């Protein structure tokens, strides 16, 4: 039997190109499983094969635990240390037992286990082989085509899957076609595919530029981000680490040669190369190209920008089906609101009027005084109440410290009165504490929800985004986040 084990291990190792150690591990597992079947109760068996002679020893073992739940497999620490004081929790007590003689059933079990272990070893080998290739472009031959995906043969018994959503629109492949894509995921636990390739994600565009533009590989040019509408249009942001190099020109190439190669690989996808800037507003202006931006207003609190363009330039700025502004939003990470110059002026005039009326009513000011505060950029009572006094006295018309002190006192009193009114409104509406404590919720929004008869988490979870869009303080995205947070708690039990 020992000679048969050695011959079998050598044959399988050579056939599968796997280390002999892996084959012996599979054989040990197979013999252990066959041995367990000889017992009428649950046991833990370990088998050790001598790789030189093929002889094997069999051990029955007990796990050292605090509390025994399976007496046939576990032993307490106190009992284990009776024979070996050095044993610790998590270690094993072993007794050598008689090794089984292989009969037909035992041999069949061994073959099944060996086959499973070999498949696992082969899959582990593929994962190890391609782990360092993750994030890079790989090339394979189409092996199988289905409605939802294709399977690529990458060589050396390695296969990768490209899902339909990771292909370009209208992209069709046949068995035998050569395909390039980015290996974006290596999944060691995958039961079917372990390697996943994409042609539609931004990483594909980035890696193609790394290949076609040597200055990127030499780190003279840096890619700062990319956004794609796969197969149609893309934007990629670049910056130069060498003042002598024009990053946009280098990426375009002589007569557009470099970017054209990338466009051809991506089925005609048009690529805008955007100059990155550490000034967010300038970066957004660059990202909106080819549209000309007339003016831009940054809202740091909401991480958004209002972009104004001339009326005859609006369609180009937005793009077909919103494509240009959508890609610019993805590339920059800012929420971008595109409108005409007239619309922007009207919007901000309305906002100024709202703030003006707030100051007039809450602070009991005349319109002229309130207008001074608005023109100086104050937009809330909190800003007036807690800004350093010297900043207010530096404003023309507000040099008097007593006047400024009175102004700040009125602002603080107005804030306190508003807070008390909010608390009374919430108490009267019987708003649930869980709703008030929801992430992203504030008392003002809670009052607006209460006016809509939404006073509990369950009631909020039942709403749609359209039901909350008339609340001025909420954007559609913020409304969606609140609703989803409520659903996660009420429907899925995620506290």
From Swiss-Prot:
Any GO molecular function: RNA binding
* Entries under SUPFAM superfamilies matching the protein: Nucleic acid-binding proteins, Prokaryotic type KH domain (KH-domain type II), Rad51 N-terminal domain-like, Transcription factor NusA, N-terminal domain
Q: What function does this protein fulfil?
A: Participates in both transcription termination and antitermination.
Q: What is this protein called?
A: Transcription termination/antitermination protein NusA
What GO terms fall under cellular component here? cytosol
Query: Which ranges carry the S1 motif domain?
Result: 135-200
Keyword Magnesium recorded? no
Where is coiled-coil annotated?
Answer: none
Self-association or partners: how does it assemble? Monomer. Binds directly to the core enzyme of the DNA-dependent RNA polymerase and to nascent RNA.
Q: List where the protein spans the membrane.
A: none
Q: Which UniProt keywords apply?
A: Cytoplasm, RNA-binding, Transcription, Transcription antitermination, Transcription regulation, Transcription termination
Q: Which InterPro entries match?
A: DNA_repair_Rad51/TF_NusA_a-hlx (IPR010995), KH_dom (IPR004087), KH_dom-like_a/b (IPR015946), KH_dom_NusA-like (IPR025249), KH_sf_prok-type (IPR009019), NA-bd_OB-fold (IPR012340), NusA_bac (IPR030842), NusA_N_sf (IPR036555)
């Amino acid at each position: 039997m020992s000679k048969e084990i050695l011959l079998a291990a050598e044959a399988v190792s050579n056939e599968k190109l796997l280390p002999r150690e892996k084959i012996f591990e599979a054989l040990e597992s197979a013999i252990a499983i066959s041995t367990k079947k000889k017992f009428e109760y649950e046991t833990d068996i370990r088998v050790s094969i001598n790789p030189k002679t093929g002889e094997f020893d069999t051990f029955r073992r007990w796990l050292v635990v605090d509390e025994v739940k399976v007496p046939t497999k576990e032993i307490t620490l106190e009992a284990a240390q009776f024979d070996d004081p050095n044993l610790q929790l998590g270690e094993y007590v072993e007794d050598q037992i008689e090794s089984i003689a292989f009969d037909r059933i035992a041999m069949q079990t061994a073959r099944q286990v060996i086959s499973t272990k070999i498949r696992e070893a082969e899959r582990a080998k593929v994962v190890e082989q391609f782990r360092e290739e993750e994030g890079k472009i790989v090339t394979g031959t189409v092996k199988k085509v289905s409605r939802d995906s294709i399977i690529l043969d990458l060589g050396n018994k390695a296969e990768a899957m490209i899902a339909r959503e990771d292909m370009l629109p209208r992209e069709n492949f046949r068995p035998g076609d050569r395909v390039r894509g980015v290996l974006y995921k290596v999944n060691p636990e995958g039961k079917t595919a372990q390697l996943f390739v994409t042609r539609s994600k931004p990483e594909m565009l980035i890696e193609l530029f790394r290949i076609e533009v040597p200055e990127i590989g030499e780190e003279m040019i840096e890619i700062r981000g990319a956004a794609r509408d796969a197969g149609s249009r893309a934007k990629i942001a670049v910056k130069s680490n060498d003042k002598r190099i024009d990053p946009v020109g280098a990426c375009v190439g002589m007569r557009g040669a470099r970017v054209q190669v990338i466009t051809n690989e991506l089925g005609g996808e048009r690529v805008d190369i955007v100059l990155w800037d550490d000034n967010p507003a300038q970066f957004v202006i660059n990202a909106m190209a080819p549209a000309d931006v007339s003016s831009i207003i940054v809202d740091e609190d909401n991480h958004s920008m209002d972009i104004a363009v001339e009326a005859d330039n609006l369609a180009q700025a937005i793009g077909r089906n919103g494509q240009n502004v959508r890609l610019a939003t993805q590339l920059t990470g800012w929420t971008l609101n595109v409108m005409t110059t007239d619309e922007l002026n009207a919007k901000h005039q309305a906002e100024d009027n709202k703030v003006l009326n707030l100051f007039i009513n809450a602070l009991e000011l005349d319109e002229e005084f309130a207008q001074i505060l608005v023109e100086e950029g104050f937009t809330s009572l909190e800003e007036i109440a807690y800004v350093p006094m010297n900043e207010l006295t530096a404003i023309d018309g507000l040099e008097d410290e007593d006047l400024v002190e009175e102004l700040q006192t009125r602002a603080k009193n107005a804030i306190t009165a508003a807070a008390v009114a909010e608390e009374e409104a919430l108490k009267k509406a019987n708003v649930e504490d869980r709703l008030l404590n929801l992430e992203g919720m504030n008392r003002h929004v809670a009052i607006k929800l209460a006016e809509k008869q939404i006073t509990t988490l369950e009631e909020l979870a039942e709403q749609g985004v359209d039901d909350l869009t008339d609340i001025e303080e909420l954007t559609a995205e913020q409304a969606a986040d609140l609703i989803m947070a409520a659903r996660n708690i009420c429907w899925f039990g995620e506290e």
